[in-house]
Amino acid sequence: MNEADVTKFVNNARKTLTDAQLLCSSANLRIVDIKKKLSSWQLSISKLNFLIVGLRQQGKFLYTILKEGIGTKLIQKQWNQAVLVVLVDEMKYWQYEITSKVQRLDGIVNELSISEKDDTDPSKLGDYISRDNVNLLNDKLKEVPVIERQIENIKLQYENMVRKVNKELIDTKLTDVTQKFQSKFGIDNLMETNVAEQFSRELTDLEKDLAEIMNSLTQHFDKTLLLQDKKIDNDEREELFKVVQGDDKELYNIFKTLHEVIDDVDKTILNLGQFLQAKIKEKTELHSEVSEIINDFNRNLEYLLIFKDISNLIDSFKNSCTQDIQTTKELCEFYDNFEESYGNLVLEAKRRKDVANRMKTILKDCEKQLQNLDAQDQEERQNFIAENGTYLPETIWPGKIDDFSSLYTLNYNVKNP
């Protein structure tokens, strides 16, 4: 065993191992890079699938909102039924009520204003009421045709939107993009999936081959270093020399095999890269269609906001009508109370007239009694003077003895109520 040979073996093993490490490291970097691209592509496909599934659910949700939320609840129940039928009927009813009450008041003569000296037409109860809010509901009813046209226009837009969402968006675009995805990347295209998995398995196998070659070269290099150790006995060292010598002769073939494996790595990477490039192009094209669908959803969202704005306007009209109905109800109640109070006032006037008549009767009776008493008093005075006047001097009761003026003065006035 020649020490020079040992040194040569060590140098050959070191150089081969170093060169192999450089080649394998570079190859491994390329493998890692292409695997990252493969993983990134697979992740992007998963995201695209998630996006498409989400859009399909959003399409169903949008269609449900249109059919049930807008079509049934908003247009049919709230607008057509609650506003154009129930609300309009209620406004017509209360407008008729208040008009009838005003006409009734206009036909009732104010008995309290009738005078024998006044030959003009007597006033009516309608002359004493405010008419500012009598036609509130009539004014609102005049706005109803405008609201009807708005509802009809929005209904046409709604029907057009439902058709587009159902036929163009859901049945056509979403269905088409779903079928394309399943055809190109989904479970319907197992071949494409198998190709990607096959490339991945090939690269993994090639990585193992590279690892085995590197392991073999490392073991050989360790053996050459062991030959330099003088502590092992000669027999064992001689046996190790033969092994190392044989392995040294195989270094060329091993290195050649390494190059072949690396060539396979590069071919696989190239094929996988071309495969990914084609798939990425297909995904990009499909993603463009998905982006167009997203834009359609955004446009539909803007249309929904239009429905919201119209709904707010109609709600505002409805609330205003409700307030006017309440005002009209209160006015009708006031007119009823006014007529009832007028009836009570007529009774009160009659009562006062009766009281005045009673007062007149009492006063006339009192006047008659006073006149009778006064006549009796006059007679008594005359008798007194006849009997006693001759004997009584005037000065004893100055101005009183022969005074025949009445003892009472009666002035009264009973108002004509």
UniProtKB/Swiss-Prot annotation:
Subcellular location(s): the record lists: Cytoplasm; Preautophagosomal structure membrane
- Which Gene Ontology cellular component terms are annotated? Atg1/ULK1 kinase complex; cytoplasm; nucleus; phagophore assembly site; phagophore assembly site membrane; protein-containing complex; vacuole-isolation membrane contact site
What keywords is this UniProt entry annotated with? Autophagy, Coiled coil, Cytoplasm, Membrane
Q: Which GO terms describe its biological process?
A: autophagosome assembly; autophagy; autophagy of mitochondrion; cellular response to nitrogen starvation; mitophagy; nucleophagy; pexophagy; piecemeal microautophagy of the nucleus
Single GO MF annotation: molecular adaptor activity
* Subunit structure, as described in the record: Forms a complex with ATG13, ATG29 and CIS1/ATG31. The ATG17-ATG29-ATG31 complex interacts with the ATG1-ATG13 complex. Forms a complex with SNX4 and ATG20. Interacts with ATG11 and the conserved oligomeric Golgi (COG) complex subunits COG1, COG3 and COG4. Interacts with ATG9 (via N-terminus); required for recruitment to the PAS during autophagy and starved conditions.
Main role? Autophagy-specific protein that functions with ATG13, ATG29, and CIS1/ATG31 in response to autophagy-inducing signals as a scaffold to recruit other ATG proteins to organize pre-autophagosomal structure (PAS) formation. Modulates the timing and magnitude of the autophagy response, such as the size of the sequestering vesicles, through interacting with and regulating ATG1 kinase activity. Plays particularly a role in pexophagy and nucleophagy. With ATG13, is required for ATG1 activation by autophosphorylation of 'Thr-226'. Recruits ATG9 to the pre-autophagosomal structure.
* Name recorded for this polypeptide: Autophagy-related protein 17
Q: Which organism is it from?
A: Saccharomyces cerevisiae (strain ATCC 204508 / S288c) (Baker's yeast)
Q: Gene encoding this chain?
A: ATG17
